[in-house]
């Protein structure tokens, strides 16, 4: 992108030779179609470009964030950063900048998805609901990231995503379903609608159950929620640094059937293939046969824990958040959901957990 190229050229001219600098730019186009009462009522699109700058000099660090519309002169930004550095404390866990050899070229000049296609996906969903009331949204996104630093690294990547999320309601029940993919054309609106309708229909006129011991089967959404919380609060190395993570590497903490990997290169994987340092991501072994194998590391956490960096630094979150795996894959078992249910004598099926917070 021309605006990025010009920014870096201008920055190179004014950065003092004894200052380490890293600049990241995120450009995203978010498109959204919303529906309620089984009718589309909103169609919007928003483009944003944000900049994240890090400066390090004399053992001190400062970070500055700007929206591109409020950037002004890069010369003034550098002056502001150098002034702030003088008043900052020493950064004892500074881990440096990514090397030039880590550069990655993944930028693609892509256009947003057609809103008519989002509308068609919504129609496909609504058509499955019969007399039930439908609501939800269909979204699509194109995001580009660029990373440059004074070590000579120059990286870029492009990621796309599309989601259809909907719910059907009867007088006594509701059923929801959603699906995500890299492109809208791979979203099956009929399938999503059929699943939501089936859940709403089968859960009509619910009855209380007696307290007791029940076998529990978790649906994919419920399992995904558990994995997200494990990733953020367990395998995030920042949680380990802070002493809040329950995860112990190379200690059997899960059932032996549990194997979990983070793989940004798996077919259909969403999100970027570089982390916020500009370095390429790789498949990471998280749990193998019930045994934790790795935390999600950033440059800073790998330095603080003296462990290998796994390159899971998040764009836009800064050092305070830590690392996060964004392409988690749980190794499947050997039987289907229907087979599992048929083997249960007294049990509960949980489709999703509701409103989970920490």
Q: Which residue stretches match the model-derived regions?
A:
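Extended amphipathic alpha-helical scaffolds
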Residues: 33, 120-191, 238-261, 265
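Dual-mode signal for accessory low-complexity, basic/Gly-rich regions
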Residues: 249-358
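Residue-level structural signal for beta-strand termini and adjacent loop
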Residues: 66-69, 180, 298-300
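Acidic low-complexity segments
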Residues: 3-8, 12, 19-32, 72-157, ...
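N-terminal alpha-helical targeting/anchoring segments
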Residues: 30-86
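A generic local secondary-structure boundary/capping motif
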Residues: 11-12, 40-43, 123-128, 150-158, ...
